[in-house]
């Protein structure tokens, strides 16, 4: 099935870099080996994030074997890019690794620190990751592309936030408070904000197909709220959300002005 939980290990990393891949292909640039290694890096990041979250929720488990193993894999890949691309790429990828380590700590959604945690990880995985992908594959990222890539973070924040809430529900550790209530409203609607931003941004570059497809994409989070949220298990819902990011990656990849 399309929502089989194991698919998340492919879809989530794809959501980090698919826009960058499509943009590179549109510029007729593609470094196959670089992309394979970069994709493995994002797979390792996702595995590390999942492992760290479980360790944060269950502090009685041993952390060091997971920390050492995942970081050895990541640093081997960083060394590859240091040898083949540029130090600036290594520094950006290292920032993703660094922010990913915040998942070692249990951050409750009713705490102010959760806001910083979500924003930093969202920017790292959904902006920096795509930025690096474009740069590694094409060798150039224009200021126009850079600005447009940032819009995608809004969709990434939505998915990351809902995943956190689903994990809390699964673990029976739900948290409430004024910080959660205010921030929850904004992030839970960031998919809608992102679509509105798309309409406004491309007002002078009106594309009827883009408008139609972005409008249809609104059905995915709407169906999540009114139907799938009550029908699927937590793991299947997470896969559903990863599919949403892949869809949005395809739309942004093809309709970003380059």
Question: Predicted regions span which residues?
Answer:
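Topogenic membrane-insertion module of multi-pass membrane proteins
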Residues: 1-51, 100, 106-121
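Small-residue-rich segments of transmembrane alpha-helices in multi-pass membrane proteins
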Residues: 10-20, 66-76, 117-134, 179-193, ...
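Helix-coil boundary and interhelical linker segments in multi-pass alpha-helical membrane proteins
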Residues: 13-38, 73-90, 127-149, 195-208, ...
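Hydrophobic core of alpha-helical transmembrane segments in multi-pass integral membrane proteins
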Residues: 15-21, 42-46, 68-80, 93-101, ...
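Solvent-exposed interhelical
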Residues: 38-71, 151-198
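C-terminal ends of transmembrane helices
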Residues: 47-57, 99-113, 159-171, 222-231
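Extended hydrophobic alpha-helices typical of membrane-associated regions
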Residues: 56-61, 183-190, 200-258
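Intramembrane alpha-helical segments
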Residues: 63-138, 224-225
């Amino acid at each position: 099935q399309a929502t089989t939980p194991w698919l998340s290990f492919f879809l989530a990393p794809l959501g980090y870099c698919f826009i960058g891949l499509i943009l590179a292909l549109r510029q007729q640039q593609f470094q196959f080996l670089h992309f394979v290694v970069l994709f493995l890096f994002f797979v390792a990041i996702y595995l590390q994030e999942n492992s760290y979250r479980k360790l944060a929720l269950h502090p009685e488990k041993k952390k060091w074997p997971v920390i050492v193993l995942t970081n050895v894999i990541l640093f081997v890949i960083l060394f590859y890019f240091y040898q083949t691309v540029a130090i600036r790429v290594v520094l950006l990828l290292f920032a993703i690794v660094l922010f990913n380590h915040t998942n070692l700590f249990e951050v409750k959604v009713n705490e102010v620190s959760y806001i910083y945690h979500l924003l930093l990880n969202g920017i790292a995985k959904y902006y920096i990751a795509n930025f690096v992908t474009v740069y590694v594959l094409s060798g150039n990222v224009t200021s126009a592309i850079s600005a447009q890539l940032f819009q995608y973070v809004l969709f990434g924040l939505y998915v990351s936030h809902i995943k956190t809430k689903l994990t809390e529900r699964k673990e029976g550790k739900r948290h409430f408070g004024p910080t959660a209530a205010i921030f929850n409203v904004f992030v839970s609607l960031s998919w809608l904000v992102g679509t509105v931003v798309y309409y406004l941004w491309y007002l002078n570059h009106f594309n009827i197909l883009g408008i139609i497809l972005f409008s249809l994409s609104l059905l995915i989070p709407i169906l999540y709220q009114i139907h799938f949220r009550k029908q699927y298990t937590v793991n299947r819902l997470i896969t559903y959300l990863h599919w949403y990011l892949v869809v949005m990656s395809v739309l942004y990849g093809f309709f970003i002005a380059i």
